[in-house]
UniProtKB/Swiss-Prot annotation:
Gene Ontology molecular functions: DNA binding; DNA-binding transcription activator activity, RNA polymerase II-specific; DNA-binding transcription factor activity, RNA polymerase II-specific; metal ion binding; RNA polymerase II cis-regulatory region sequence-specific DNA binding; sequence-specific DNA binding; sequence-specific double-stranded DNA binding
Amino acid composition bias (Basic and acidic residues), ranges on this chain: 155-172
The UniProt record lists the keyword Metal-binding: yes
Domain of life: Eukaryota
UniProt-listed InterPro entries: GCM, GCM_dom_sf, GCM_large, GCM_small, Tscrpt_reg_GCM
UniProt-recorded name of the protein: Chorion-specific transcription factor GCMb
Region feature C-terminal conserved inhibitory domain (CCID), mapped onto this chain: 379-395
Ligand binding (Zn(2+) 2): C87, C91, C118, C121
Keyword Cytoplasm listed: no
Annotated GO CC locations: chromatin; nucleus
Length: 506
């Protein structure tokens, strides 16, 4: 049927064709009583008036593939036809129809669609554009005015009809269902195979029967390998080796006779000495191992200092300094002059004075005269009322320095005692003056008694030649205090200078 005849038949049947109006008129017909039926495939120069309640008209629905086009009038919606996508081989479907796909609205999607193969014959696809409006695409116009929606088409489609939008949606949904039915069993089989593999991998250990009597098997741990359950070697606690300061038992101690040497010296060890504090409230922070001295069996160690007639081992010392060394890297005294004294008191300390084999270090040739001049006592006793026994260095009147040895010419106000003489101290807490009994050997002089506190001054010793930085660290004193509540060891450097070198005091 010719297009003019179709247009005439549609125009005769259309109510909108009976009225004279154009989509661009400023004033549209008003008070409309009749409306046209919705047309999905309008073709040619036609006009329709739809009711504003028509759902398809509200969506601007059309069977042709139409896209929105720019329009300067905001009240008028302009759409143009895209054409149709067909197979290049003009293949036919099983029902005998031709493949005529609906072109995609988006430009990029339309280009991708053209690169795809024909779903029927897998040949190439091509787009047939619409040129039905004087060489341009057929244009449709939509306008809402009052209670009516006005539609006007310009041009005749010169291409076959594509799939309608409803048909395209139905086809796509069918394809999706088909693909889902194809991939769902495959995914299910993949999941089942993965589950079987997991069961197989875990089945190696699941087939092992459990132990019937686990208590029959004993676990033997290697004692040489440190484990969390086995404590690692650590520093011994101080309260284990704490010496009780019992006055009754302390009075029964007696020193063995001292050993006599031809050349009395002060033997100081090269490595630093460490002392264990007898107070359980402090922990040992010294990097050196703790040395414990047993009164019954004394090993040959480097903790003993031989001072001609007195050898002492200090187990109570400063709680702030777990370890101090008598010899630093330059073999000098570690604390320097001017430093604050380290005076600490402990509740359970013990001062032991007994003989042991001295440690000889040839790098420290320190000696002093063994036979002092008459009238110069070796030890000066000072009696006080605080029951404090301290040994301090006595300042000599003169001292001569040589390359390797400093010798003391005279020791004034000192009493010399034989080297084989033992001494026992009998302190009494907070009572009358204490007496110090000096027990003599069979060949020594009779014991002497000293009332009150015993304050002994040790002789000044000579230190080998060292740099100035180390010589300034050579003035220290030891104060050993005994009281009724405990003992105190004071490592004091507050004494004035007693070494003289080149008319300079150190």
């Amino acid at each position: 049927m010719p297009a003019a005849a179709v247009q005439e038949a549609v125009g005769v049947c259309s109510y909108g064709m009976q009225l004279s109006w154009d989509i661009n008129d400023p004033q549209m017909p008003q008070e409309l009583a009749l409306f046209d039926q919705f047309r999905e495939w309008p073709d040619g120069y036609v006009r329709f008036i739809y009711s504003s309640d028509e759902k398809k008209a509200q969506r601007h629905l059309s069977g042709w593939a139409m896209r929105n086009t720019n329009n300067h009038n905001g009240h008028i919606l302009k759409k143009s036809c895209l054409g149709v996508v067909v197979c290049t081989q003009a293949c036919t479907l099983p029902d005998g129809s031709r493949l005529q796909l609906r072109p995609a609205i988006c430009d990029k999607a339309r280009l991708k669609q053209q690169k795809k193969a024909c779903p029927n014959c897998h040949s190439a696809l091509e787009l047939i554009p619409c040129r039905g409006h004087s060489g341009y695409p057929v244009t449709n116009f939509w306008r809402l005015d009052g209670n009516a929606i006005f539609f006007q088409a310009k041009g005749v489609h010169d291409h076959p009809r594509p799939e309608s939008k409803s048909e395209t949606e139905a086809r796509r949904s069918a394809i999706k269902r088909q693909m889902a039915s194809f991939y769902q069993p495959q995914k299910k089989r993949i999941r089942e195979s993965e589950a079987e593999e997991n069961q197989d991998s875990s089945g190696h250990f699941s087939n092992i029967p459990p132990l019937e009597n686990p208590e029959d098997f004993d676990i033997v741990t290697e004692t040489s390998f440190p484990i969390p359950g086995q404590p690692c070697p650590s520093f011994p606690k101080s309260d284990v080796y704490k010496a009780t300061c019992d006055l009754a038992t302390f009075q029964g101690d007696k020193m063995p006779p001292f050993q006599k040497y031809s050349s009395p010296r002060i033997y100081l060890p090269r490595p630093p000495c460490s002392y264990e504090l007898a107070n359980p409230g402090y922990t040992n922070s010294s990097p050196y191992p703790t040395l414990y001295k047993d009164s019954t069996s004394i090993p040959n160690d480097t903790d003993w200092v031989h001072l001609n007639t007195l050898q002492c081992n200090v187990n109570s010392y400063s709680s702030y300094e777990r370890s101090f060394d008598f010899t630093n890297k330059q073999h000098g005294w570690k604390p320097a002059l001017g430093k604050p004294s380290l005076v600490e008191r402990t509740n359970h300390g013990q001062f032991q004075a007994m003989a042991t084999r001295p440690y000889y270090n040839p790098e420290l040739p320190c000696r002093y005269l063994t036979t002092p001049p008459p009238g110069a006592p070796a030890l000066q006793t000072v009696i006080t009322t605080t029951t404090k026994v301290s040994y301090q260095a006595y300042q000599p009147p003169a001292m001569k320095y040589s390359d390797s040895v400093r010798e003391v010419k005279s020791l004034s106000s000192c009493n010399y005692a034989p080297e084989d003489t033992g001494m026992s101290v009998y302190p009494e807490p907070w009572g009358p003056p204490v007496t110090v009994t000096r027990a003599a050997s069979p060949s020594g002089p009779p014991p002497m008694k000293i009332a009150g506190d015993c304050r002994a001054i040790r002789p000044t010793v000579a230190i080998p030649h060292e740099p100035v930085s180390s010589r300034t660290d050579e003035a220290e004193t030891w104060d050993v205090c005994l009281s009724g509540l405990g003992s105190a060891v004071s490592y004091s450097d507050r004494v004035g200078p007693f070494f003289t070198y080149n008319n300079e005091d150190f």
